[in-house]
């Protein structure tokens, strides 16, 4: 599992790339699948923070077909500008490899699948304070749309593993910026 794989419109998935193995993840109202290590760290994070009654897993792994359906639905319902801001193109979504999670508050049962509510609460704040200690980063931070190509998504987290999550969070980087940093470091020592 390459937890640092960069996936976006400039770095699409390889043809037919799928996660090798998926497991049912806990703390969801429906069946959500993730790669085993991601599910394990998600569960550890939720239990360690005591948020079992406050947050839920809204989404995880999606097939390319499901991603295409979501893109087309959003396009029809919300238009192109909105869809490009909040929905990755099919073949360019981290959800397709089982390393991305969308998190929502339990009290928001009528949550939007595209933009679940996950901010302005003590539960979201606590999650944000601890996520990096379990390998997660906020994938699309505020004021970084020019870098990521996706608008601020306070509900969307990516598993990158330790210590990467701690470095990325401490530096307030995106995964794209971390990739640039790693490439520059390699060039310095090559």
Swiss-Prot record:
Q: Where does Cu(2+) bind?
A: 95, 102, 156
Instruction: Spell out the catalytic residues.
Output: 153 (catalytic acid/base residue)
Enzyme Commission number: 3.4.13.22, 3.4.17.-
Reaction(s) this enzyme catalyzes, per UniProt: D-alanyl-D-alanine + H2O = 2 D-alanine; UDP-N-acetyl-alpha-D-muramoyl-L-alanyl-gamma-D-glutamyl-L-lysyl-D-alanyl-D-alanine + H2O = UDP-N-acetyl-alpha-D-muramoyl-L-alanyl-gamma-D-glutamyl-L-lysyl-D-alanine + D-alanine
Q: Name one GO cellular component term.
A: cytoplasm
Q: Which CDD domains match?
A: DD-dipeptidase_VanXYc (cd14849)
Q: Could you tell me the Gene Ontology terms of the biological process aspect for this record?
A: proteolysis
Keyword match Ribosomal protein: no
Entry coiled-coil feature ranges: none
Indicate where this protein is primarily found.
Answer: cytoplasm
Which UniProt key words apply to this protein?
Antibiotic resistance, Carboxypeptidase, Cytoplasm, Disulfide bond, Hydrolase, Metal-binding, Multifunctional enzyme, Protease, Zinc
Report residues binding Mg(2+): 66
Keyword rRNA processing listed: no
What InterPro entries does the annotation carry?
Bact_PeptidoProc_Enz, Hedgehog_sig/DD-Pept_Zn-bd_sf, Pept_M15B
Task: List residues binding Zn(2+).
Answer: 95, 102, 156
Location within or outside the cell? Cytoplasm
State a single Pfam family of this protein: VanY
Enzyme class per UniProt: hydrolase
One Gene Ontology term of the molecular function aspect: metal ion binding
Record-listed a dipeptide binding positions? 67, 88, 93, 95, 102, 155-156
* Source domain of life: Bacteria
Q: What upregulates or represses it?
A: Expression regulated by upstream promoter elements. Part of the probable VanC-type operon associated with vancomycin resistance.
The record describes its quaternary structure and partners as: Homodimer.
Similarity annotation: Belongs to the peptidase M15D family.
Functional description taken from the UniProt entry: Bifunctional enzyme, exhibiting dipeptidase and carboxypeptidase activities. Catalyzes hydrolysis of the D-alanyl-D-alanine dipeptide. Cleaves the C-terminal D-alanine residue of UDP-muramyl-pentapeptide[Ala] (UDP-MurNAc-L-Ala-D-Glu-L-Lys-D-Ala-D-Ala). Shows no activity against the pentapeptide with a C-terminal D-serine residue. Together with VanC/VanC1 and VanT, required for vancomycin resistance in E.gallinarum strain BM4174.
Protein's recorded name: Bifunctional D-Ala-D-Ala dipeptidase and D-Ala-D-Ala carboxypeptidase VanXYC
Q: Which organism is it from?
A: Enterococcus gallinarum
Lineage of the native species? Bacteria, Bacillati, Bacillota, Bacilli, Lactobacillales
């Amino acid at each position: 599992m390459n937890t640092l794989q960069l996936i976006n419109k400039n770095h699409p998935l390889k043809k037919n790339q799928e996660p090798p193995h998926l497991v049912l993840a806990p703390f969801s109202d429906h069946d959500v699948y993730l790669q085993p290590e991601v599910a394990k760290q998600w569960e550890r994070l939720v239990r360690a923070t005591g948020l079992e009654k406050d947050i839920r897993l809204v989404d995880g792994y999606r097939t390319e077909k499901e991603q295409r359906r979501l893109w087309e639905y959003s396009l029809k319902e919300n238009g192109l500008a909105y869809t490009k801001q909040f929905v990755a193109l099919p073949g360019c979504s981290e959800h397709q490899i089982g390393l991305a999670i969308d998190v929502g508050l339990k009290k928001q049962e009528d949550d939007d699948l595209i933009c679940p509510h996950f901010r302005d609460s003590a539960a979201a704040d606590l999650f944000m304070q601890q996520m990096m200690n379990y390998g997660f980063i906020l994938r699309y931070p505020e004021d970084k749309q020019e870098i990521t190509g996706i608008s601020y998504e306070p509900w969307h987290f990516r598993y990158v593993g330790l210590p990467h999550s701690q470095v990325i969070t401490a530096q307030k980087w995106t995964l794209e910026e971390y990739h640039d940093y790693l490439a520059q470091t390699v060039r310095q020592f090559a």
